Amino acid sequence: NKLITLLGNLGVKIQKNGPGDYTFQADEVNVDYLKTEAFKKEGGSLRGSIMIVGPLLARFGCGYIPKPGGDKIGRRRLDTHFEGFINLGAKFRYEREDHFYGVEVEGRLKGAYMLLDEASVTGTANIVMAAVLAEGITTIYNAACEPYLQQLCKMLNSMGAKITGIGSNLITIEGVESLG
């Protein structure tokens, strides 16, 4: 699995417990890896690599990604992800020559009210993963409410997040200092 390999290259400890069953421990993440040519190549071959940006932004104040490749099932926008991060206080940058996206924040992200222009499942998930560690309250209107997102929110709550509205298109997140 390319995403598991990518996480391992970032320094995440990975334990395979059985078929399709893994444990991940991300206590020593090498954020500098995000700026390497190896990451640009690896991340660019996987559409799902966008999903690491929100958690990295929340924990380390930065998240970078090459233009995602992978499957070719039509056009899927990234702007919902980045607009959500900007609403939380991040600054966006794009390096045209490398097709490399980045978001950065000084200090913690700040909770915000936001209306998503599309109910993107991955966009909502990425914003939720960033907002759980933001300072204050984040309210997401027009949030996706698919089962995948409900499972993610329930898992985050079991780790100490404070998310309400799970399963609806209005999600409220009270930011916490850390997850366990």
Residue spans for each PLM region:
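Structural preference for solvent-exposed beta-strand-turn elements
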Residues: N1-G180
